[in-house]
């Protein structure tokens, strides 16, 4: 029986790859990218709830069960998905295709007892017990393999997801855009260049075939009759032909280079242009290395289509033309050449699957290694402050060694294929020589004819030899096409066919009405949240970490859509507005400030590219950033290092605040925007906010409650719900959750369970850590 195997693209793709295998078993083809979305896969992977949800959506009846060893041998539907723990201690999923099955309960128990007795006997005799029970699994990170039940149970957690297709299950192939068609669309505007490349190739082919007649004329016409005058003419003609061939070859190479560049620009920029249009969910659930390696995929595809594809087309044409000539010259020798070609084609098919597996492993490991390097360099300060350089280097070394091992296996496969190909060509070439020379000796063929045949036969056999040598590159391009197509087919964050209203300014109340939301298939981040931000009022969100404050800001910025409920601005549903116009109308300062390798002036005016230097300076003064900028060597023209390295956390936050103030929006969202500032600077900035921006709407997410005590409304959140609301004074009078947080920060909260001893004063920064709702969701 043939089993359907799908390799994962990334370490978090195992669940999606397993479900893709099950779907393929039932004749349904669906991409890993689509399944990731259906499951709610994120950087932590996928949980069982997400897998069940996706399977049911596809039309499967599902049951998550826990089985012991005896029950695993009972009869149940396969393929199914099993949870295992890898040797590195990570949760992982594999597909179970087939296993030892004993239907009768009594026989199964007797089987287990017999097996236990055999184990004891082997242990007593010092022998190794050989388990005859087997499991055939598809491990998306490794391979399809048959292992013993003992080996399987070393990693099996006992959890299975059983799946049976229902009447709602639909077979068929998921509709995908064709990467080949996309590429041909890129080539079409360059059709003139492509035509020149083909024309030059045809001319070179004709010249090559004509040149093969040189030896025949020399051997059969000139040497036997001593035609010295004709010799000079023939040499002169063929010299001109060869020089012409060299010049045309050079022109062809220039055309191909220029064609490659002309295709490269729209292909590469088109990929990143599409990536920038993707929703935040896409970036939040993927590692940076996984996204950047698709750039390499695009480069691989371009290389194949602009050079290899053209060569293959011309090689095929050349093989057909020379094949006809060779057949007419000598049918016997031609049959040997045909046999050589057929063996070479057979060799390509034999090595197709090994090359496919090794290419998939190479690409997956490349993404993992890139992500590891990016994470290590991005977190270098944390690595150094904890003196973890050696440990981080060990982790990087492990991934690099894995890459080298895969590369070594790839080289071994290529070497074996190359050796077999060389043997086929050499042995059959010798056979051709023997038969040809015998025909010359027997007078059945002239020496010149034989030499011409030998020269021409290379034009016939070389295309297939080239195909064999390029098989790795071609199959790598096929995998790259599949991976890149999945990204290019990923839906943009906004429907480009729909007409949206453009938001000029936020000039009304903002209302959240019964809004619920969750990240993927995780626990709800928000549950039935309702509140209003009156126009021109200041509203604060407070809570302990992971309660949903930042999620509210992300929904308001249209990074995500609510699972249920509505968000409206001035009575109009937020969904009616285009994403870009909503974000332009809001001045947002996130928790994590991102600065770019540009001047300070350019970094601040990102929010308003047309802003003058005077306007940027005015915004910097509001953010209390002007003074520290003046002390820099080139002041506002100072070029920042990558990610603003060299600036303190407080300086980065002040630049981010300057961006927001430069935008001069009607709604400001400050998400822990002053957490790195000292109390004096923080108070200065909030005094400016309450005075100079008194008429602007504002949503402030804060842990330091002293900064939001003057807000018009304070919302207290707990586990995704609003548990209290009111002004600072009203909430203190209630002596509820807000009172506890305030008292804790003021150092006067008493632990009622332990007595009346006052708690030691603790700064707000020590009470709670910076919130990241995406990271605080539990399984």
Regions found by a protein language model. Give the residues of each.
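Loop segments that connect adjacent transmembrane helices in multi-pass transporters
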Residues: 273-290, 361-409, 481, 499-501, ...
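Membrane-integrated ABC transporters
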Residues: 1-210, 224, 228-233, 252, ...
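Cytosolic ends of transmembrane helices, especially the final helix of ABC transmembrane type-1 domains
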Residues: 365, 369, 381-388, 412, ...
């Amino acid at each position: 029986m043939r089993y359907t195997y799908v390799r994962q693209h990334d370490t978090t793709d195992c669940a999606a790859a397993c479900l893709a295998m099950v779907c393929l078993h039932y004749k349904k083809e669906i991409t890993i990218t689509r399944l990731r979305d259906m499951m709610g896969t994120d950087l932590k992977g996928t949980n069982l709830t997400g897998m069940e949800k996706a399977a049911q959506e596809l039309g499967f009846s599902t049951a998550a069960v826990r089985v012991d060893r005896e029950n695993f041998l009972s009869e149940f539907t396969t393929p199914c998905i099993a949870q295992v723990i890898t040797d590195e201690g990570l949760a992982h999923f594999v597909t179970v295709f087939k296993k030892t099955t004993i239907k009768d309960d009594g026989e199964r128990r007797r089987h287990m007892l017999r097996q236990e007795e055999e184990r004891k006997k082997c242990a007593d005799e010092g022998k190794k017990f050989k388990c005859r029970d087997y499991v055939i699994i598809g491990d998306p990170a490794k391979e399809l393999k048959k292992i013993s039940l003992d080996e399987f149970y070393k990693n099996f957690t006992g959890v299975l997801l059983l799946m049976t297709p229902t009447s709602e299950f639909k077979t068929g192939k998921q509709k995908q855009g064709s990467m080949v068609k996309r590429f041909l669309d890129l080539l079409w505007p360059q059709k003139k260049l492509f035509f020149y490349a083909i024309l030059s190739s045809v001319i070179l082919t004709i010249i090559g075939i004509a040149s093969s007649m040189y030896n025949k004329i020399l051997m059969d016409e000139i040497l036997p009759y001593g035609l010295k005058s004709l010799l000079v003419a023939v040499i002169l003609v063929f010299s001109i032909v060869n020089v012409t061939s060299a010049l045309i070859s050079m022109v062809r190479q220039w055309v191909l280079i220029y064609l490659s560049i002309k295709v490269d620009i729209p292909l590469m920029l088109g990929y990143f242009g599409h990536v920038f249009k993707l929703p935040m969910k896409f970036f939040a659930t993927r590692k940076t290395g996984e996204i950047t390696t698709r750039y390499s995929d695009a480069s691989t595809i371009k290389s194949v289509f602009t050079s290899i594809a053209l060569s293959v087309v011309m090689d095929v044409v050349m093989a057909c033309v020379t094949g006809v000539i060779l057949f007419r010259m000598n049918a016997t020798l031609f049959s040997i050449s045909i046999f050589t070609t057929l063996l070479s084609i057979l060799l390509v098919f034999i090595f197709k699957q090994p090359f496919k597996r090794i290419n998939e492993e190479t690409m997956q490991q490349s993404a993992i290694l890139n992500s590891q390097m990016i994470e290590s360099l991005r977190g270098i300060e944390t690595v150094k402050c904890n003196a973890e350089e050696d440990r981080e280097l060990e982790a990087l070394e492990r991934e690099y060694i894995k890459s080298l091992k895969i590369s070594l296996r790839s080289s071994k496969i290529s070497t074996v294929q190359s050796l077999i190909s060389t043997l086929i060509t050499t042995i059959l070439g010798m056979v051709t020589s023997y038969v040809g020379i015998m025909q010359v000796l027997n007078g059945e063929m002239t020496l010149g004819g034989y030499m011409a045949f030998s020269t021409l036969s290379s034009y016939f056999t070389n295309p297939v030899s080239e195909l064999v040598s390029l098989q790795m590159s071609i199959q790598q391009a096929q995998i790259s096409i599949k991976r890149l197509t999945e990204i290019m087919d990923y839906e943009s964050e906004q429907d480009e066919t729909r007409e949206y209203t453009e938001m000029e300014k936020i000039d009304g109340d903002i209302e959240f009405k019964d809004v619920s939301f969750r990240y993927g298939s995780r626990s709800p981040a928000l549950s039935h949240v309702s509140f209003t931000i009156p126009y021109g009022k200041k509203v604060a969100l407070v809570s302990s970490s992971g309660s949903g404050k930042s999620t509210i800001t992300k929904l308001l910025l249209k990074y995500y859509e609510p699972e249920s409920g509505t968000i409206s601005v001035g009575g109009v549903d937020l969904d009616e507005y285009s994403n870009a116009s909503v974000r332009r109308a809001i001045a947002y300062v996130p928790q994590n400030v991102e600065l770019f390798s540009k001047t300070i002036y350019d970094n601040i005016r990102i929010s308003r590219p047309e802003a003058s230097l005077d306007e940027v300076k005015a915004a910097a003064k509001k953010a209390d950033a002007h003074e520290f900028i003046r002390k820099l060597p080139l002041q506002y023209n100072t070029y920042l290092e990558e990610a603003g390295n060299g600036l303190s956390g407080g300086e980065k936050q002040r630049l981010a605040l300057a961006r927001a103030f430069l935008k001069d929006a009607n709604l400001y969202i400050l998400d822990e925007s002053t957490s790195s500032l000292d109390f004096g600077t923080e108070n200065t900035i909030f005094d400016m906010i309450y005075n100079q921006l008194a008429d602007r709407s504002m949503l402030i997410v804060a842990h330091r409650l002293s900064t939001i005590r003057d807000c018009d409304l304070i919302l207290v959140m707990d586990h995704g719900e609003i548990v209290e609301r009111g002004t600072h004074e009203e909430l203190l009078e209630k002596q509820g959750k807000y009172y506890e947080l305030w008292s804790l920060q003021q150092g006067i909260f008493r632990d009622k369970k332990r007595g009346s001893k006052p708690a030691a004063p603790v700064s707000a920064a020590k009470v709670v850590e910076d919130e990241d709702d995406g990271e605080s969701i539990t399984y």
